[in-house]
Swiss-Prot record:
InterPro entries, per the entry: Phytosulfokine (IPR009438)
Chain residues in the propeptide: 25-76, 82-87
Protein name from the UniProt record: Phytosulfokines 1
GO biological process: cell differentiation; cell population proliferation
Pfam families: PSK (PF06404)
Organism field: Arabidopsis thaliana (Mouse-ear cress)
Primary role: Promotes plant cell differentiation, organogenesis and somatic embryogenesis as well as cell proliferation.
């Protein structure tokens, strides 16, 4: 029985689609997927809160306190962005 061109085209398209999906799953199982954040890193970030080394005393206004915290966080980011903190 002779197949039409459209049936052959659909067959090859489906085959390519299935192979590409299978190859992406295999690559992810081998460790080529982006790393997942560890729970300890997430816990440290969530429990850190306002304890970032900047203390706002009662004499500081809310705006001054926010500026101090922003500068401290930015400085921390600058000096730690090249570090590999993953365990």
């Amino acid at each position: 029985m002779m197949k039409t061109k459209s049936e052959v085209l659909i067959f090859f398209f489906t085959l390519v689609l299935l192979l590409s999906m299978a190859s992406s799953v295999i690559l992810r199982e081998d460790g080529f997927a982006p790393p997942k954040p560890s729970p300890t890193t997430h816990e440290k970030a969530s429990t850190k809160g306002d304890r970032d080394g900047v203390e706002c005393k009662n004499s500081d206004s809310e705006e001054e306190c926010l500026v101090k915290k922003t500068v401290a966080a930015h400085t921390d980011y600058i000096y730690t962005q090249d570090l590999n903190l993953s365990p």
